[in-house]
Amino acid sequence: MEREFVMIKPDGVKRGLVGEIISRIERKGLKIVAMKMLKLDREMAERLYEEHKGKPFFDDLISYVTSGPVVAMVVEGPNAVEVMRRMIGDTDGAKAAPGTIRGDFALSKARNVVHATDSPEKVAREMSIFFRDDEIVEGYELCHSIY
């Protein structure tokens, strides 16, 4: 099974979209194996977005993601990175397809509700910023039976 790091950004939390986003993830068949709400400090935010350091939007991005609470998650499932990237849609909400998280909820390219790691090679690094190994739950199966 592949893992993916997902973070609901401050605009998603402040607008009450956490439950909707989690529901979409679970309905798609991805399993949440770690989750926490926290307020990022500058150091964590800079580590998460280190690939953008030096770009014109970097300081605004860091200010934005440290402006309020976020919900960090690790999800697991077959092709989790690809599945999650398709679910969230284009970085620019105006270009994101309807039905994707960003297509439905993004306010702008900067305030686009959710972050998800863009490649399997980066997942372990991003997960380690937020979670220790012992915080990731192992060994449970999803049961979609209706009672």
Swiss-Prot record:
It is found in: Cytoplasm. It is an enzyme of class 2 (transferase). SMART domains: NDK (SM00562). ATP binds at residues 9, 57, 85, 91, 102, 112. The active site is at residue 115. CDD domains: NDPk_I. It catalyses: a 2'-deoxyribonucleoside 5'-diphosphate + ATP = a 2'-deoxyribonucleoside 5'-triphosphate + ADP; a ribonucleoside 5'-diphosphate + ATP = a ribonucleoside 5'-triphosphate + ADP. InterPro entries: NDK-like_dom (IPR034907), NDK-like_dom_sf (IPR036850), Nucleoside_diP_kinase (IPR001564). Keywords: ATP-binding, Cytoplasm, Kinase, Magnesium, Metal-binding, Nucleotide metabolism, Nucleotide-binding, Phosphoprotein, Transferase. Its cofactor is Mg(2+). GO terms for molecular function: ATP binding; metal ion binding; nucleoside diphosphate kinase activity. One of its GO terms (biological process) is GTP biosynthetic process. Its EC number is 2.7.4.6. Its main location: cytoplasm. It comes from the Archaea. GO terms for cellular component: cytoplasm. Pfam families: NDK (PF00334). Belongs to the NDK family. Major role in the synthesis of nucleoside triphosphates other than ATP. The ATP gamma phosphate is transferred to the NDP beta phosphate via a ping-pong mechanism, using a phosphorylated active-site intermediate. This is Nucleoside diphosphate kinase. It comes from Ignicoccus hospitalis (strain KIN4/I / DSM 18386 / JCM 14125).
